Amino acid sequence: LTQALCEKLEGRGKVAVLVGTPGAPCHEERALGVRSVIEQHPGMEIVELEYDEDTVEKAYAYTKQLLERHPDLAGIVCCNMSNPVGAARAVIEAGRQGQVVIVGMDHDQEALGYLRDGTIYALGVQDCYSIGFDTVQVAVMIADGVLPGEAYPEKTQETTTIVYQNGAADMLRTLYGVID
């Protein structure tokens, strides 16, 4: 996702990062990934990183503050499911659609609506079925006494699909039955 943002911004601009819960492994790993990608683009800078504790309201409030403190903010990377919604609401309220590029995680219905209308540039949609299936499968193995590394990896890699505006309607239809 961050690479998509960098390409959209042509490797230039100030970027903010919204993260969910401090210490949540997947949120922290995503934030580290954002940093590592941004570091590869000398014309880009992370100006702030904020934790919204997985609330749309805090993501919205932080984004409003970010837009006020950084009127030249070019992009926002959102590391969890609530960030993109809060960021999009604040960007719309500030009249900055098309000026601030938002990328984010997950498939919240409201976020997909913002993707469809172009407020959000791209979303990373996780394969929730596989995540659930793998979790139950590993839980059964653990209950049967199987140790990590024997029949299953200690950590699994799940699929994330990057969805852009042209794929938003299909994703809304598939996940939520929304038909335009």
Stretches with model-predicted labels:
Residues 24-27, 52, 56, 77-80, ...:
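Solvent-exposed, acidic/flexible segments
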Residues 1-15, 29, 58-60, 107-111, ...:
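Hydrophobic alpha-helical segments within soluble ligand-binding/sensing domains
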Residues 1-32, 36-37, 41-43, 47:
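Extracytoplasmic substrate-binding proteins
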Residues 4-8, 12, 37-41, 65-69, ...:
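Structured segments of extracytoplasmic/periplasmic soluble domains
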Residues 1-4, 17-19, 49, 117-129:
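Short beta-strand elements at the ligand-binding edges of bilobed clamshell
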Residues 18-22, 26, 37, 130-180:
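Hinge/cleft segment of the Venus flytrap/periplasmic-binding protein
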Residues 33-34, 47-48, 52-114:
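Hydrophobic alpha-helical
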Residues 19-23, 81-83, 106-109, 127-129:
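Glycine-rich beta-alpha junction loops
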